[in-house]
Amino acid sequence: MIEFRNVSFSYGDAPVVENLSFSIQKGETVGLIGANGAGKSTIMKLMLGLISGTGEINVDGLPMNKQNLAEIRRKIGFVLQDSDNQMFMPTVYEDMIFGPRNYGLSKEETEKRVDSVLAQLGLQSLKHRHNHKISGGEKRMAAIATILAMEPEMILMDEPSTALDPVNRRTVINTINRLPQTKLIASHDLDMILDTCQRVILLSRGAIVADGEAEAILRDQQLLEDNRMELPFCLQGFQKK
């Protein structure tokens, strides 16, 4: 689905990511973890073609270039960390139809998609609600719904559990686990990563220091501490130094 080959990116003379090589297969759910400044957001921007570096990026067999950029972006949905930046129309319904209509779908087909996604997520009651009158958890779920309405093949999520209470956080986790799309989740919430991801890529200062089975990496206390992180909360107290 996505392949990076020796990808590097710098701001001026300051390298942000260096010689990254990895691939994500169709249907995988991958966690992208690392301390602040590790390069997580940069990788997502590179995948969306928002910035360009050196090396090769291929999405579903398409090289990342100007000619393919529009098609690549239609394949990838991006759930932002701050839902207020994603839900910019007056109502949930208006936000959900914005993408499909701009892709040229008919009003009837768009309506079917919206109703199908809302039913899939159990959010029918939000359809005509005003965005400023719904809770933070409802808005996060509505933001996911707007992306699903565009039927992407892959979904990028930036800190999807941030600022949610335990009930809404669990709702988001359960939703992520039900989605069939390929998913890349960048988060500091390692408990959520443990609950949702089969694989983890651990970054430090723009380089991959571990890439493998999620539970093995997230149980490795020394590895995490060496890279300025702690064990998932659910595992603390059960590991020996």
Where are these regions (language model features)?
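H-loop/switch region of ABC-family ATPase nucleotide-binding domains
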Residues: 187-188
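Catalytic Walker B motif of ABC-type/P-loop ATPase nucleotide-binding domains
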Residues: 155-158
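A short, surface-exposed alpha-helical micro-motif characterized by mixed small hydrophobic
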Residues: 193-195
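Conserved beta-strand-loop-alpha-helix hinge in the C-terminal portion
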Residues: 207-230
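The feature captures the beta-strand-to-loop junction immediately N-terminal to the Walker
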Residues: 33-35
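Conserved ABC transporter NBD signature motif
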Residues: 53-64, 72
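Conserved ABC ATPase "signature" region
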Residues: 108-126
